[in-house]
Amino acid sequence: MPMNVETRETKKVLNHLPSEETVEKTLKRLQTFSGDQSVVVGLSGGVDSSLTAALLCKAGWDVEGLTLWLMKGKGSCCSDGLVDAAGICDQLGIKHHIVDSKEIFQKEIINNVLKGYEEGITPLPCSRCNKSVKFSEMLKWVKENKNIEKIATGHYARIRYSNESFNENDLPSNGIKRHKLLRGKDLNKDQSYFLYDLPQEILGRTIFPLGELTKEITRIEALKHSLKTAKKPESQDLCLAEHYGSMNAFIDKYLPQKKGEVVLKSGQIIGSHNGIQHFTIGQRKGLGIAWEVPLHVVEIDASLNRVIVAPREDSGKSECIVKDINWVSIEAPQEPIKVEVQIRYRSKAVKAKLIPIFDSNKENYCYQCHIHFEEDQFSITPGQAAVFYMGDYVLGGGLISKEY
């Protein structure tokens, strides 16, 4: 029995060693940038942003907290998040600022999401919110408060700045130095997929202190710091779904139901639906159709108010068009390159060939590209992001287009 107890205690100590070493490395890296620098931390009221603020304080930064008020009511983006964020700032002894961003959130996110569903696409509000609301609002606030130099958030991603020296021999380059975005070390929590659209100006002023940590280490460190949010449950849903109860509840509140047809790829009508906004590519459940084989949504035709379905084996595609591209770690390529493409959050990046499509009206810049996958992909969904990787580096990304 004593041996078992000793073994358990030994394992407990050993399990904590990587945590200590990783956090020490993170603190040293933060300290090399600190000096007399100031930073504002985007605080959501969750454990990730709370530990971000705590680590920066410990590393010697002059820290202030900022929370965006995005929606009225309860939830992480609403009053609950504001209260928890204020509590963390009080605990850490730092200033807390609240920015009323409800109007821009309505315009850039809610209106855009609803428009997308009406057009038969599946919007990706998180990446749009990061670029057009969260980081842009924080940058705007920083510029108005000239004593603040940097922005920090609790995202699980990493940045290599243009003045840092790293081995990047495998990255295509034309000699122009860029701030580079990388996956977070914790691949189970990596959020780089949602950050592909951040411009260079924002990346150059942003810090991701949790980029080298795992979620488990974050929890351990939050408990060590006795942070009030250390045991707060993680949000499992989009903020819109959390706020309204579900995405369907959100959609039903704003978009009217409109009866339409469910058809096979041949055009044969096999059922009906109450609104294309309730469907997404790849969906199998909730079709309300009994068929000899399982059917999946393969296309949504907004012009005809139709949902097209097919067996899984008939729904794979080997290519797609990606539009509205933001190039991150490299300049826009001038010729085809081999990449790995991630077409959904948490999905595995797959090998593909990226062929630039040049716009003669925009100085032959590559805002679109043609993606040829090495193997057929299931559920290539218009409106979702296709993010291009080379190893851990985010080369760029854009939105999957309906046009092909």
From Swiss-Prot:
Could you tell me the keywords of this UniProt record? ATP-binding, Cytoplasm, Disulfide bond, Nucleotide-binding, RNA-binding, Transferase, tRNA processing, tRNA-binding
The UniProt entry annotates the active site at C129, C239
Cite the Gene3D superfamilies for this sequence: Adenine nucleotide alpha hydrolases-like domains, HUPs, Translation factors
| Annotated catalysed reactions | S-sulfanyl-L-cysteinyl-[protein] + uridine(34) in tRNA + AH2 + ATP = 2-thiouridine(34) in tRNA + L-cysteinyl-[protein] + A + AMP + diphosphate + H(+)
GO terms for MF: ATP binding; tRNA binding; tRNA-uridine 2-sulfurtransferase activity
Region listing for Interaction with tRNA, in residue ranges: 189-191, 344-345
Q: Which domain of life is it from?
A: Bacteria
Cellular component GO terms held in the UniProt record: cytoplasm
Q: Where in the cell is it found?
A: Cytoplasm
Q: Where is this site: Interaction with tRNA?
A: H155, Q384
The UniProt record lists the EC number as 2.8.1.13
Could you tell me which Pfam families the record lists for this protein? tRNA_Me_trans, tRNA_Me_trans_C, tRNA_Me_trans_M
- Nucleotide-binding recorded as keyword: yes
Q: What pairs make up the disulfide bonds?
A: C129-C239
Looking at its record, which EC class is this enzyme?
A: transferase
Which BP terms from GO are recorded? tRNA wobble position uridine thiolation
Which annotated residues bind ATP?
A: G42, L43, S44, G45, G46, V47, D48, S49, L68, G154
- Can you tell me which family this protein belongs to? Belongs to the MnmA/TRMU family.
**Function text:** Catalyzes the 2-thiolation of uridine at the wobble position (U34) of tRNA, leading to the formation of s(2)U34.
Stated name of the protein = tRNA-specific 2-thiouridylase MnmA
Q: Which organism is this protein's natural source? A: Prochlorococcus marinus (strain NATL1A)
Q: Which classification does the entry list for the species?
A: Bacteria, Bacillati, Cyanobacteriota, Cyanophyceae, Synechococcales
